[in-house]
Amino acid sequence: MRVFRLFDSIRNIAFFEPPRYHAPMRAFKHPIPSDVTLERLLYALSDPVRLEIVRCLAGVEEASCGELDGGRPKSTMSHHFRVLRDAGLVHTRNVGTTHMNSLRAEDLDQRFPGLLHSILAQA
């Protein structure tokens, strides 16, 4: 939070907080199922943190980034979610100021039948 000082004279200092304005969040870009490649998918799942995120999402319909962060820094988790989105594993949508994530299991099963289930069974 930034606080600004106004000087109306040398002895009088007034502090004020500027009005808060939150612009609407941009929608995330997700690859179409036919653009999902096996290389990107396997790369995204090669990191233990991302694999744990996918494992958690497999057990629920949807979860926020905060529910999945495991106490890790926000910037680190933002990177992991971007890699998962770019690989086509996760769909992220905005709900107010929260990002809700869901596993794109149906899309992945159409593109690579049984792959996600096999990976999660072994993890």
Predicted regions and their residues:
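Helix-centric, low-specificity signal for extended rod-like, repetitive segments
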Residues: 4, 13, 43, 48, ...
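Intrinsically disordered, low-complexity regions enriched for glutamine and histidine
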Residues: 20, 77-78, 97
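Compositionally biased, intrinsically disordered low-complexity segments enriched
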Residues: 24, 81-82, 101
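Short hydrophobic/aromatic-rich motifs at helix boundaries and adjacent loops
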Residues: 25-26, 36-37, 52-53, 76-79, ...
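N-terminal helix-turn-helix DNA-binding core of bacterial DNA-binding proteins
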Residues: 39-73, 95, 99-107
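Canonical helix-turn-helix DNA-binding module
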Residues: 66-92
